[in-house]
Amino acid sequence: MSYKIVTLPTYRAVGLSWEGTFSDIDPDLKNVIKQSEDRADELVYKVNPGVQLGLNYHVIENGFAHYAVYEVSEEQELPNGMVEIRVPEWTYVKTTHNKGDNIQQTYMDLHQWLFDSDYTAFKEAGVNYYDPYMPIKHEHYPVNSDPNDPHFDIYIPIVKK
Protein backbone atom coordinates (compact mmCIF):
# COMPACT_ATOMS: atom_id res chain seq x y z
CA MET A 1 0.00 0.00 0.00
CA SER A 2 1.32 3.45 -0.85
CA TYR A 3 0.88 6.66 1.11
CA LYS A 4 1.25 10.20 -0.15
CA ILE A 5 1.18 13.54 1.68
CA VAL A 6 -1.10 16.01 -0.12
CA THR A 7 -2.65 19.39 0.65
CA LEU A 8 -6.16 20.02 -0.62
CA PRO A 9 -7.53 23.56 -0.85
CA THR A 10 -10.68 24.68 0.93
CA TYR A 11 -13.81 23.39 -0.74
CA ARG A 12 -17.59 23.48 -0.44
CA ALA A 13 -19.67 20.30 -0.61
CA VAL A 14 -23.42 19.72 -0.71
CA GLY A 15 -25.49 16.58 -0.19
CA LEU A 16 -27.07 14.66 2.66
CA SER A 17 -25.91 13.99 6.21
CA TRP A 18 -26.37 11.21 8.73
CA GLU A 19 -25.43 10.76 12.38
CA GLY A 20 -25.59 7.45 14.14
CA THR A 21 -23.88 4.54 15.80
CA PHE A 22 -21.88 1.84 14.10
CA SER A 23 -24.82 -0.56 14.56
CA ASP A 24 -27.04 1.80 12.53
CA ILE A 25 -24.81 1.80 9.44
CA ASP A 26 -26.76 -0.94 7.69
CA PRO A 27 -29.30 0.01 6.42
CA ASP A 28 -29.58 3.63 7.67
CA LEU A 29 -26.30 5.11 6.40
CA LYS A 30 -26.40 3.08 3.20
CA ASN A 31 -29.87 4.52 2.49
CA VAL A 32 -28.61 8.10 2.95
CA ILE A 33 -25.69 7.45 0.60
CA LYS A 34 -28.08 6.00 -2.00
CA GLN A 35 -30.43 9.00 -1.62
CA SER A 36 -27.49 11.35 -2.14
CA GLU A 37 -26.56 9.48 -5.32
CA ASP A 38 -30.18 9.60 -6.51
CA ARG A 39 -30.34 13.37 -5.96
CA ALA A 40 -26.93 14.17 -7.46
CA ASP A 41 -28.54 15.60 -10.61
CA GLU A 42 -29.94 18.44 -8.47
CA LEU A 43 -26.37 19.67 -8.09
CA VAL A 44 -25.69 21.40 -11.39
CA TYR A 45 -22.39 22.97 -10.29
CA LYS A 46 -20.48 19.85 -9.23
CA VAL A 47 -16.72 20.40 -9.45
CA ASN A 48 -15.95 16.70 -9.97
CA PRO A 49 -19.19 14.92 -10.92
CA GLY A 50 -17.45 11.54 -11.07
CA VAL A 51 -16.65 11.47 -7.33
CA GLN A 52 -18.98 11.19 -4.34
CA LEU A 53 -17.43 12.21 -1.03
CA GLY A 54 -17.97 10.38 2.25
CA LEU A 55 -16.81 12.75 4.98
CA ASN A 56 -16.72 11.10 8.41
CA TYR A 57 -16.30 12.89 11.74
CA HIS A 58 -16.16 10.73 14.87
CA VAL A 59 -18.01 13.17 17.12
CA ILE A 60 -20.54 10.66 18.48
CA GLU A 61 -19.76 7.99 21.03
CA ASN A 62 -19.75 4.59 19.27
CA GLY A 63 -20.57 6.31 16.00
CA PHE A 64 -19.94 9.25 13.72
CA ALA A 65 -21.39 12.00 11.57
CA HIS A 66 -21.28 11.28 7.84
CA TYR A 67 -21.72 13.63 4.91
CA ALA A 68 -22.61 11.96 1.59
CA VAL A 69 -21.78 14.97 -0.57
CA TYR A 70 -20.34 16.29 -3.82
CA GLU A 71 -17.86 19.12 -4.15
CA VAL A 72 -19.65 22.12 -5.68
CA SER A 73 -18.80 25.66 -6.73
CA GLU A 74 -20.14 28.76 -5.00
CA GLU A 75 -22.81 29.13 -7.71
CA GLN A 76 -24.60 26.03 -6.43
CA GLU A 77 -27.79 26.79 -4.51
CA LEU A 78 -28.67 24.54 -1.59
CA PRO A 79 -31.47 22.17 -2.70
CA ASN A 80 -34.32 21.53 -0.29
CA GLY A 81 -33.39 18.96 2.37
CA MET A 82 -29.67 19.02 1.60
CA VAL A 83 -26.82 20.27 3.78
CA GLU A 84 -23.66 22.20 3.06
CA ILE A 85 -20.24 21.60 4.57
CA ARG A 86 -17.10 23.64 4.05
CA VAL A 87 -13.84 21.78 4.39
CA PRO A 88 -10.80 23.97 5.16
CA GLU A 89 -7.42 23.57 3.52
CA TRP A 90 -5.80 20.62 5.25
CA THR A 91 -2.78 18.42 4.71
CA TYR A 92 -3.69 14.75 4.39
CA VAL A 93 -2.16 11.35 4.13
CA LYS A 94 -3.76 9.77 1.08
CA THR A 95 -4.03 6.09 0.25
CA THR A 96 -6.32 3.91 -1.83
CA HIS A 97 -8.56 1.07 -0.75
CA ASN A 98 -8.74 -1.38 -3.65
CA LYS A 99 -11.74 -3.44 -4.68
CA GLY A 100 -11.44 -6.93 -3.20
CA ASP A 101 -9.34 -5.83 -0.22
CA ASN A 102 -10.54 -5.87 3.37
CA ILE A 103 -11.58 -2.34 4.41
CA GLN A 104 -10.73 -2.97 8.06
CA GLN A 105 -7.23 -4.11 7.05
CA THR A 106 -6.77 -1.02 4.86
CA TYR A 107 -7.51 1.18 7.86
CA MET A 108 -5.33 -0.93 10.19
CA ASP A 109 -2.42 -0.53 7.76
CA LEU A 110 -3.07 3.21 7.57
CA HIS A 111 -3.13 3.42 11.36
CA GLN A 112 0.23 1.64 11.52
CA TRP A 113 1.68 3.99 8.90
CA LEU A 114 0.55 6.99 10.96
CA PHE A 115 2.02 5.48 14.13
CA ASP A 116 5.39 4.92 12.41
CA SER A 117 5.44 8.28 10.59
CA ASP A 118 6.33 11.84 11.59
CA TYR A 119 2.60 12.70 11.55
CA THR A 120 -0.44 12.39 13.75
CA ALA A 121 -4.11 12.80 12.95
CA PHE A 122 -5.38 16.37 12.97
CA LYS A 123 -8.08 17.30 15.49
CA GLU A 124 -10.08 20.51 15.26
CA ALA A 125 -9.75 22.67 18.37
CA GLY A 126 -12.78 22.60 20.64
CA VAL A 127 -14.25 19.44 19.10
CA ASN A 128 -14.71 16.31 21.20
CA TYR A 129 -13.73 13.27 19.11
CA TYR A 130 -14.39 9.65 20.04
CA ASP A 131 -11.72 8.14 17.78
CA PRO A 132 -8.29 9.22 19.07
CA TYR A 133 -6.38 7.74 16.11
CA MET A 134 -8.27 8.89 13.00
CA PRO A 135 -11.08 11.21 14.13
CA ILE A 136 -11.67 12.59 10.63
CA LYS A 137 -11.83 10.27 7.63
CA HIS A 138 -12.60 11.54 4.14
CA GLU A 139 -13.34 8.95 1.49
CA HIS A 140 -13.56 9.77 -2.23
CA TYR A 141 -15.68 7.24 -4.15
CA PRO A 142 -15.82 7.04 -7.94
CA VAL A 143 -19.51 7.10 -8.86
CA ASN A 144 -19.13 3.69 -10.55
CA SER A 145 -17.79 2.08 -7.35
CA ASP A 146 -19.58 -1.11 -6.24
CA PRO A 147 -21.15 -0.33 -2.83
CA ASN A 148 -20.72 -3.99 -1.78
CA ASP A 149 -17.03 -4.09 -2.73
CA PRO A 150 -15.91 -0.50 -3.22
CA HIS A 151 -12.66 1.06 -4.30
CA PHE A 152 -11.95 4.56 -3.03
CA ASP A 153 -9.30 7.01 -1.94
CA ILE A 154 -8.86 7.74 1.76
CA TYR A 155 -7.74 11.14 3.05
CA ILE A 156 -6.83 11.57 6.73
CA PRO A 157 -6.05 15.14 7.87
CA ILE A 158 -2.64 15.18 9.56
CA VAL A 159 -0.15 17.43 11.33
CA LYS A 160 3.51 16.94 12.22
CA LYS A 161 4.10 15.23 15.58
Regions found by a protein language model. Name each.
Residues M1-K161:
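A solvent-exposed interaction/effector surface
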